[in-house]
Curated annotation (Swiss-Prot):
Keywords: ATP synthesis, ATP-binding, Cell membrane, CF(1), Hydrogen ion transport, Ion transport, Membrane, Nucleotide-binding, Translocase, Transport. It catalyses: ATP + H2O + 4 H(+)(in) = ADP + phosphate + 5 H(+)(out). This is ATP synthase subunit alpha. ATP binds at residues 169-176. The record marks 362 as: Required for activity. The gene is atpA. It is a peripheral membrane protein.
Length: 518
């Protein structure tokens, strides 16, 4: 009996030791109304903006409207069991997402929860989804190239690490293909990638993930997705989750590439939320702060100086236009935020010119400083030539009386356009790009019949493989010295002679003279 008594006394003493005077304050409110994924909650007077609110049945939401007597909460997931009078509880936490290397190779939703069926993510670190972008004094100028592996972009519209380059165009013009090819091309280059899919079909996301898996690119990539079947609140949150995951590696001094596919659907989701929250509509029914929505997101992509780690986030936002109208509200907003745009055109795409980038309307504002010298040396007047060709080509449709000079410009233009064609999923190395551009700049392509240009490109890659001394020197020096240029010129003359000699019924006098190849 005494033993039992001593045991009880010990237990009571132990509980007294644990006693704390600290008061845990739990704020609980009531749902006034719920409809279309928005709950009006009363009794949460001290709620924070973007705070996570918990409801019954494990439903969560984010506080977006803080009014005098109520809080407007956008709900995540199935809210069918939430009724008027249901309880809502503050979590005292603003929206957070897991970050770190554990996110690599995973597919997560807007809340950072895995949706790939590969079990939970054992993250040790979490970070706030909404943050202020790095300040001016922490940044550094963009001067390192981000290799896309796409000849047109690397030659004419180079992208630097830390740049924001918009990809804009109608549906089905190859916008996502450019972004995915760029991710694939980062293999072995120590660049982490984040692909953010917003409002897309489940089948489209699955297809992209499959393409990344087949090319062994998921090892360094995280996919953040909110598909068309997800509520507007999830689509709204997705890009902020993506950039937060990318910022973890930025702080580690790493280079990151993030793709937002696409911000048009993101703006529509935000418009939906804003109208349901009864915020006043503006132009095209978008709320007044839709510019700030995208500017605060894209300003988080930057290049930091050495004192802050020297990392970078390069952003490729995608915008879908209607009937090629880039002067609409959202496209003009994002064009003014970003450091350049690639304008994709339907008629080029349909005519087989892929990637279908419009040379005249596309621009890269800061990337030229990041372009390697070997490519810069060969692209002096190429953009002007292509713009001139484009103008003359449309003019030549109306009449057949063309002078000799115009015919030469058109013939050269056709060959250049054929040279910059590139199949999907086949990125080029920068050295091969420099060699293609050398062939264009030194007019070796004029000897090649139009139908054989693709085979000639293949032959260049076979001839100048990674073991070739010229390839090795360009890859090392990143520029053409006088000696290297002369050496490359001689090698190309020999290559062209061998190539055309194998063509059936080839007559060199139609294209030039044999003396030019001596």
């Amino acid at each position: 009996m005494a033993d039992k008594l001593n045991e009880y006394v010990a237990l009571i003493k132990n509980e007294i030791k644990k006693y704390s005077k600290q008061i845990f304050n739990s704020e609980i409110g009531k749902v006034i109304s719920v409809a279309d994924g928005i709950a009006k909650v009363s009794g949460l007077e001290n709620a924070l903006l973007n705070e996570l609110i918990e409801f019954e049945n494990n439903v969560q939401g984010i506080a977006l409207n803080l009014e005098q007597n109520t809080v407007g909460v956008a709900l995540f997931g199935d809210y069918s069991k939430i009724r008027e009078g249901s309880t809502a509880k503050r979590t005292h936490n603003v929206m957070q997402t897991p970050v770190g290397d554990v996110m690599l190779g995973r597919i997560v939703n807007a809340l950072g929860e895995p949706v790939d069926g590969r079990g939970p993510i054992k993250a040790e670190e979490f970070d706030q989804v909404e943050k202020i972008a790095p300040g001016v004094m922490t940044r550094k100028t963009v001067n390192q190239p981000l290799e896309t592996g796409i000849l047109t972009i690397d030659a004419l519209f180079p992208i630097g690490k830390g740049q924001r380059e918009l990809i804009v165009g109608d549906r089905q013009t190859g916008k996502t293909s450019i972004a995915i090819d760029t991710i694939i091309n980062q293999r072995g280059k120590d660049v982490y990638c984040v692909y953010v899919a917003m409002g897309q079909k489940n089948s489209s996301v699955a297809q992209i993930v499959h393409q990344l898996e087949v090319t062994d690119s998921m090892k360094y990539t995280t996919v953040v997705c909110a598909t068309a079947s997800d509520p507007a609140s999830m689509i709204y949150l997705t890009p902020f989750t993506g950039i937060t995951i990318a910022e973890y590696w930025l702080k580690q001094g790493k280079d990151v590439l993030i793709v937002f596919d696409d911000l048009s659907k993101h703006a529509i989701a935000y418009r939906t939320l804003s109208l349901l929250l009864r915020r006043p509509p503006g132009r095209e029914a978008f709320p007044g702060d839709v510019f700030y929505l995208h500017s605060r997101l894209l300003e988080r992509a930057c290049r930091l100086n050495e004192e802050h780690g020297g990392g970078s986030i390069t952003a490729l936002p995608i915008i879908e236009t209607q009937a090629g109208d880039i002067s609409a509200y959202i496209p003009t907003n994002v064009i003014s935020i970003t450091d350049g745009q690639l304008f994709m055109v339907s008629n080029l795409f349909n005519s087989g010119q892929r990637p279908a980038i419009h040379v005249g309307l596309s621009v890269s504002r800061v990337g030229s400083a990041a372009q390697i010298k070997a490519i810069k040396q060969q692209t002096g007047s190429l953009k002007l030539e292509l713009a001139q060709y484009s103008e003359l080509d449309s003019f030549s449709q109306f009449g057949s009386d063309l002078d000799e000079n115009t015919k030469q410009i058109l013939e050269r233009g056709k060959r250049v356009m054929e040279m910059i064609k590139q199949p999907n999923g086949k990125p080029y190395s920068q050295t091969h790009e420099a060699l293609f551009l050398f062939a264009i700049a030194k007019s070796f392509i004029k000897f090649i019949p139009l139908d054989y240009i693709a085979k000639f490109k293949q032959r260049i890659m076979e001839e100048f493989d990674k073991e070739h001394p010229i390839y090795k020197e360009i890859a090392t020096q990143k520029s053409f010295s006088e000696a290297l240029e002369a050496q490359t010129n001689t090698a190309f003359k020999a290559l062209v002679k061998r190539f055309v000699s194998a063509l059936p019924d080839y007559d060199i006098t139609k294209y030039g003279t044999m003396e030019e190849l001596e």
